[in-house]
Amino acid sequence: MQSLPETNHLIIKLRSVADTLKEADLRARFFLQLLVRLNPMNLTAKILLALLLLQCKPGLTQEFTIPAISDLPRIDRQSPRPATAILRNSAFILKLKHHAPLGSGYVIITDHTDDPYMAALRELAEYRQAKIIHVADLGKIYQQDVLSAVRKQLIDLKPQYVAIAPRLESYRENMLLGMWELLSTLDDDKYLDAYPGVLLASDAKSFAALIQRSIKFESIAQKQLKPLAISQVPSNQESRSLQKAGILRNVFSSFGIQTPTIAIYTPAADDAPHLSGPQTWNIQMKNKGDFVKKFEPAAATALADASLVIMHGHGSPGMSCSVDIDGILTRSNNQIVLSGSCFAAAPLKTDFPKMTRIPGGYAVTPRQSFSTRYIDRGATVFFGHMRLSSGFPHLYPVLEKWMQGKSVGESYQQLINSLMDMRGLGPGKFVVQEVTPEQRGVPQNILLYVIIGDPALVPLQPLEKINKR
């Protein structure tokens, strides 16, 4: 009989090998369950069999399929739990929840005091006929005395739209969660009672330029819409982000719109699936940790021409889907950008425990966020997440609302309200007061999506499918 130390050593070895493979956590659990079921075999034989199966990566590669958008389940709190394969591939869509705003006004909440920032906000306020509420520090908006004072003003002003304009140093997780506490307590129900949007850039010049673009922005018409998809393929086994590019191509094709696609393959994805068709570029990275800082001319031209950029894949501060912030074009038509990667809208300072490793195996280092770099280089709207993003299931319903002609703020409000419902969060449960260093998961992480943009701005004119014309 196998001794306990030897057994433990083999189990540890199995887990070690499993951890070297992408998505190995799911397969390791499967094989550990398999060991228990193989009763006639001794433990050593079971371990060796599982190790052999784990190493046979080609045989374990997920089948690459591109389902129709209509075949993806729409999920809310009452929905049955989807199959494991659907969850693993993020092949589902969050159902969004409509909730009427408190009124029809427009309010700007800010802690800026410097003249260049305030001049830009006053110009936006004049354009939107808005009122400006000033607080000393938006990073502490969740404090009860501040909440009470601002809440009273909002109830009196009855806003439809609320633009949140924090200083860069007050842009943090509890600032955003504190805003959800504020906007969900303007009446008796638990939902956000206004359409929010975040106004943020890395400096006063970029901030003023963002406001100018927002004021001058005209919703993009179907004939002028030029989407582009960027997907990261991190391994031969993990192709779900590439799948989302295929889904998006089919969605836009139904509107008579072509979607150029850039797929970026890490060194571990040397035998992964590829999309075919015109205007498709496959970039194979040579070294682990390399990110794209310059695109080949043809891909760069297509990217520069795109008015809508949609990205799927892993990310870290300063990187999204294997594209480095230095790879963001200095001159482009990229007006609307959605990133489903983690940390795409990361704050410079965090209210949460520092993370050292994140999905994809990337290190978390302090860098300018992908979102503010894109805003600095001319984007008008950016969708991202402060920390760990769920990607497509939460990104696509926002994009879908924009394709229906909804505003930045309405889509943002519906996303947060639906996520509140999904996770059972509400007033009194938003702000994270204490988190232990060893705590792995923070439930409020799900509410840390950020949409930078004027909340009243409508990104797209409603799209009409070509078979309905």
Name what the model sees in each region.
Residues 8-9, 19, 25, 39:
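Intrinsic-disorder-associated, low-complexity terminal segments enriched in Asp/Asn/His/Tyr and depleted
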Residues 2, 13-15, 19:
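Short linear segments in intrinsically disordered or otherwise low-structure-confidence regions
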